[in-house]
């Protein structure tokens, strides 16, 4: 955990949100985007997005993604025709950003502890990686993370240990992404801290993802849905994830399948 939740944290966080959350949600659904919520046939996606929109009063939806806020903003415009609406809360930048889903404004109560862990890390790590073979910067606007594309054939994987000597974590995922994150910060740690701030019961939470940067969510012990199109490296971790269900369906179909598996099928029409 990044920090102990401050007394009165729930009410303080609600004050930082631009739109209210469900008071007592029956389900807290935490979804990755690419390969998960954004995957499936157009028919499946329209049906699932429509359900999320109709059930906002009892399903608290959280995006938990590697995308930065600018990319999420573009996505919500791009997929509006499919019925995709803003979530209640966004965890972005692989856990380094927490924002109101409606306004995409960062929430200081959740972000400040992450910011403190990143202080003094950016410059030395960026200098170390400058010009590294098999590595190219991702065009993102994140301030608490370094993000690169990497070529698994030419990148020197031995460099990961050298990167982490700077007091950061280095995460490889989907055979193409390399993220440098504040030590101890990931999708799972930030999600757990958010749930504690909001005083949400863990037995109402279901997470869903498809790539290696979702592993930290599944390692929390919360109910997890590994969608059927999950990358091989994530599937390999399944035997040590007793609370994670491997769905047959891809993307949205897999999420729905997982909701039924964990006893939330009554919420689906």
Where are the regions a protein language model picked out?
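Active-site phosphate-binding/coordination module
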Residues: 42-137, 229
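Short, aromatic/basic amphipathic alpha-helical patches
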Residues: 76-78, 160-163, 234-239
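Non-catalytic pre-domain segments flanking phosphatase-related domains
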Residues: 1-33, 44, 50, 54, ...
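Conserved acidic, metal-coordinating active-site core of Asp-based
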Residues: 122-220
């Amino acid at each position: 955990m990044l920090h102990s939740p401050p007394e009165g944290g729930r009410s303080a966080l609600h004050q930082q949100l631009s739109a209210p959350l469900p008071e007592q949600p029956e389900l807290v659904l935490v979804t990755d985007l690419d390969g998960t919520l954004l995957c499936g046939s157009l028919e499946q996606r329209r049906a699932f997005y429509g359900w999320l929109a109709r059930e906002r009063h009892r399903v608290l939806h959280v995006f938990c993604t590697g995308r930065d806020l600018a990319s999420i903003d573009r996505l919500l415009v791009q997929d509006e025709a499919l019925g995709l609406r803003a979530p209640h809360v966004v965890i972005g930048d692989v856990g380094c950003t927490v924002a109101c889903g409606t306004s995409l404004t960062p929430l200081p109560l959740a972000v400040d502890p992450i910011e403190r862990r990143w202080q003094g890390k950016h410059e030395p790590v960026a200098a170390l990686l400058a010009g590294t073979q098999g590595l190219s910067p991702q065009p993102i606007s994140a301030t608490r993370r370094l993000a690169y594309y990497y070529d698994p054939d030419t990148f020197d994987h031995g460099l990961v240990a050298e990167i982490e000597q700077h007091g950061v974590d280095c995460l490889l995922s989907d055979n193409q992404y390399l993220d440098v994150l504040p030590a101890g910060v990931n999708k799972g740690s930030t999600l757990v801290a958010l749930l504690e701030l909001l005083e949400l019961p863990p037995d109402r939470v279901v997470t869903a993802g498809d790539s290696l940067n979702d592993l930290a969510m599944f390692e929390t012990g919360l109910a997890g849905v590994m969608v059927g199109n999950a990358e091989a490296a994530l599937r390999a971790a399944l035997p040590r994830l007793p609370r994670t269900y491997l769905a047959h369906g891809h993307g949205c179909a897999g999420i729905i399948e997982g909701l039924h598996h964990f006893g939330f099928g009554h919420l689906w029409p």
